[in-house]
Amino acid sequence: MSRKKNKNSLSTFVNTILTIFGENPFKPMNYKQIAKIMSVRDAAGKDVIYQILVTLFNEGKLIEDRPYRYLLHPDFIHEYGPKPQYITGTVDMKSTGKAYVIPDEEGEDIFIAANNTGKALHGDKVKVAMFPKRKSKKNEGEIIEIIERAKTEFVGIFSLSHGFAFVVPDRQTMPLSIFIPKGKYKSSKDGQKVIVHLTDWPDNAKNPFGAIVKVLGNPGENNVEMQSILAEYDYPLDFPKAVEKEAKSISEKIPSSEIMKRHDFRDVFTVTIDPHDAKDFDDALSLQYLPNGNYEVGVHIADVSHYVQPGSAIDAEAQERGTSVYLVDRTIPMLPEKLCNNVCSLRPDEEKLAFSTVFELNENADIKNVWIGKTVIKSNRRYAYEEVQDMIEGADGDNKRELMILNDLATKLRAKRMKDGCINFHSEEVKFILDENGKPLDTYIKVQKEANMLIEDFMLLANKTIAETIAKPDSKFKDYTFVFRIHDEPNPEKLYNFIQLVSKLGYTMNISSREKLVKSYNTLFDAVDGKGEKNLVETVAIRTMAKAVYSTTNIGHYGLAFSYYTHFTSPIRRYPDLMVHRLIERYLIENQPSVDKEEYEDLCLHASEMEKRAAEM
């Protein structure tokens, strides 16, 4: 009995010592410090503690930080330390193999050393066991569970050796090569670009295993590189057969019964104004002179919702894609070509179905009346921006009087927006001139001119009006679920860094109020226009801003200074616009009850993610 009791007492003694180290994981301690914490004062007791420390060190449970001062080995911290805190989040992997986990809830990012990432990959949803926080040190932890794998297919270079092969991923956030067992090569040749699917990751393997699912071709070839970009972002190049079959069955002919249900604008002057190489015309403007001297301006948007029904194969695919993707040499559309370039596209001299917002405006561009509803239109003419810009600058052209009236009204709408506090981000885009093989020959800067802003101003007006119709406090639909385009205020830390940057360039910013900050932004943009620092200042300024996203919870749009804003005007290339069309029809025309908020919030999150992904391509 006595021996058993002594054995139990010694075991308890050892556990107590390990617990003391566990509760002080970053504090090296010797036997005297342990004895003091345990209130052991006699020499014999201290000697026992000394012997236990030596034994624990020899067993690998303690490590010697400095002579005779010990720390608990990291492998035993979770066993003997405080109960660990667990956090879930998303992995942000670095090329070095270390990572950060961005918590699902508010909080600082969590550092994960390369040897603590386990088998997690970039973008994975994971569970992290937090390490006890050390003073003045960053949050740190260990990934202990992969909740959801973000990506299982990667693009990379196939590298063949004797009897085995690897794929070296293109993506810097994938720091590991993927082992390809014999028999899983497909028809890959050494040095080719391929798509590899992760199949396994054995416990004793440093690298994941995979199988080649598609050979793309030789790196550097234009078509191969474009396919690589799409595959890397999991964006499909082709539509599923079920989608193509469904699109093929859609009739291009509009039944007279459908025309009878709609407001007829076929005899009203209507035009489209787009880039010279555009094929999908999803917006048109109409103009009528009213007897009272005012103008009726119609913003007509392709009625995609008439052709794409919820639950259809086309709708499911469009929802998954979220947006059309614009690469250097091609467009990957959200909808099949028959719809986006033909049936829905508001091409000239063709009867087309539209969803319209029609405004009565006086000569000062004050809104006197608004009508929202389904229409049938027939565009008189398709214009390129360059043609309209030439007329604005003095050239003659067809329908110049009507186009100049539209431009005058747009200019006045713009002035009102600027007065209300809109931030005037100047937009310049680098465009490439390609040869027939997709190789760049030259570049040029695409500058937004008045013709571009003419269209933009009326699209902004339509989007704002649609959102206000649903969400303003006096609307009967104010509590209904809706899709908003929201934009939060600038990040304070990024704003501070931006102010420091521009001050070194000789510019000042006033941040004492929103109004003064906006005025400072606009004054700054005017001041740098035409100067060498223009691109730097505008790029960093945009980065101070929050990213605009879709949400069912409205916070307004900071950059536009709109309390209510949505996307209604591009349903051919943006799925949220199609969602908005359906909601407007459901609420305003059919007088149906609200849809489920949680379901639509999930759709908004997905659309925002796909928009972000498309911008990165």
List each language-model region with its residue ranges.
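Charge-lined substrate channels and their catalytic hotspots, especially those that engage the 3′ end
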Residues: 2-298, 305-350, 382
